[in-house]
Amino acid sequence: MSDWILSIEGTPAGHTAAMILALTAALLHAIFGSLQKGRIDPWLSRGAIDSAQVLLALPLALFLVPWPEGHEWLLVLGALPIHFCYKVGMALAYSRGAFTVVYPIVRGMGPVFTVIGAYLVFGETFSLTQWLGVLALMTGIFGLAVYNLKTIKVDRDTLVPALWLAAGTGGLVAVYTTYDAFAIRGTPNPFTFLAWFFVVASVDMPIVAALRWRRMTDRPPLARLVRLGVTGAIIAFGSFGSVMLATRLDKVGEAAVLRETSTVFAALIGWLVLRETVGPRRIALMSLIAVGAVIVELGG
């Protein structure tokens, strides 16, 4: 598999594969986000997911992929503090604000800063047409957040800090996307970085969750946390793994923009699975997000 990934890197086939991977990551990330903002405390849910990630990824890292060498260990370890800050930001935002408001803002902040980061780190550039696509996509995402903000009835007393936390966490999305792209490109075998990333960058939140668990009086059933953790870990492998491979194969900025169509998938999940009302305005905003992504993809 790694030989095939390396063989199509920087080719038209690689571009197509990167597009498919980024869209797959978008769908899976929407599902992943809804799991963390479920009925279980977001700190516990993230801890359960990360615990499962360590247990599932460790055998792969130890026995199925080449071990990191020299500077590759530094690349893997460098992801830990960045992703820890991101996960803390997400948990803080989710514990204070509604998912339908927090999630679009976090994802909406990422694309423009990632495109700038990709320019500074990798020398990537966007055409004027692609920037117009980014503008359309971000307008749709933030429009969706504003619409949800006006209609929600829960968590309104803590909404302002939730919005600030969501905006800051969105900036961290750009930081970790750029860093992960740099790291996976600096590792000869991309699956070496992926396997060890899911081990090393997942050891922190289980500790935080365990400390929180000890202080709780109304604890959720352990079996429920285990099911959530395993399900979330498998989805995370597909989501984060797909977008990282996409940034290895093609432009980081384009992969980041396509991934943010996850807000469309999140709204569709709410409509089809949770039976939430969509309405013409949300349909128009989701269409704008999709159109923006198409413009970015075709305008390069």
State where each predicted segment sits.
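Alpha-helical transmembrane segments and their membrane-interface junctions
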Residues: 178, 242-259
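Hydrophobic transmembrane alpha-helices of multi-pass small-molecule transport proteins
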Residues: 1-3, 57, 115-119, 129-148, ...
